[in-house]
């Protein structure tokens, strides 16, 4: 009987920490999917290029608020930035809760194009940022068109330290874990003392 109580109290004490960490991981993994997709590059004339980026997957819980796209060209190098501003579908705020910025450069000649891409995801709901980077990847140019399948070589994920709401939540979860552990230890010692 005592073992059941110990297991149930320990389970209840660990649940807030597990729930919090799994929700961060879920947000983190779904947000990263916005950085994967296909980049279409088409050189229409000598000095006119057309770039289009289509993400593979858009998480169902976000609505697009706005997007920006800028392209600069210097000789055979094209620099582009594609920004998404998304809002949580069920949130009450009108402000964006997710900002995704895909930027990179594309170098081309008559037979191939080389793409170097980085993606920054800033999740304002979880106060986390993710940076994905790729090295130069080469693709064949077919009829002045190049289709680049975007993949990444490194992923860096970090959480903001100065966010007050997440710090309060972290502190509450840790206090609950410590308090419930102390309750279990005191209960076990009292039971042992009574039995001896």
UniProtKB/Swiss-Prot annotation:
Q: Which family does it belong to?
A: Belongs to the orthopoxvirus OPG172 protein family.
What main location does UniProt list? Answer: host cell
Topological region Extracellular:
22-167
User: Which GO CC terms are listed, alphabetically?
Assistant: host cell membrane; host cell surface; membrane
Q: Tell me any Pfam family this protein matches.
A: Orthopox_A43R
Q: Tell me the leader sequence span.
A: 1-21
**Transmembrane segments annotated in the record for this chain:** 168-188
Q: Which residues lie on this side of the membrane: Cytoplasmic?
A: 189-196
- Report how it sits in the membrane: Single-pass type I membrane protein
| Induction and repression of expression | Expressed in the late phase of the viral replicative cycle.
Q: What is this protein called?
A: Protein OPG172
User: Which superkingdom is the protein from?
Assistant: Viruses
Q: Which species?
A: Monkeypox virus
Any idea where this protein resides? Answer: Host membrane; Host cell surface
Keywords (A to Z) from UniProt: Glycoprotein, Host membrane, Membrane, Signal, Transmembrane, Transmembrane helix
Give the glycosylated residues. Answer: 66, 116
């Amino acid at each position: 009987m005592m073992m059941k109580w110990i297991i149930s109290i320990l389970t209840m004490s660990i649940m807030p920490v597990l729930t919090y960490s799994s929700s961060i991981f879920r947000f983190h993994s779904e947000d990263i999917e916005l950085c994967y997709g296909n980049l279409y590059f088409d050189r229409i004339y000598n000095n006119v290029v057309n770039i289009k980026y289509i993400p593979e997957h858009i998480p169902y819980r976000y609505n697009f608020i706005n997007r920006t796209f800028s392209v600069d060209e210097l000789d055979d190098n094209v620099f582009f930035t594609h920004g998404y501003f998304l809002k949580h579908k069920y949130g009450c705020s009108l402000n964006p809760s997710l900002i995704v910025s895909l930027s990179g450069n594309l170098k081309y000649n008559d037979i191939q194009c080389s793409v170097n891409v980085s993606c920054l995801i800033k999740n304002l709901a979880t106060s986390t940022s993710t940076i994905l980077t790729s090295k130069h990847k080469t693709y064949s140019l077919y009829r002045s068109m190049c289709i680049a399948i975007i993949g990444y070589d490194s992923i860096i994920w970090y959480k903001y330290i100065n966010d007050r709401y997440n710090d309060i939540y972290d502190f509450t979860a840790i206090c609950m874990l410590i308090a419930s552990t102390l309750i279990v230890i005191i209960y076990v010692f009292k039971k042992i003392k009574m039995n001896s």
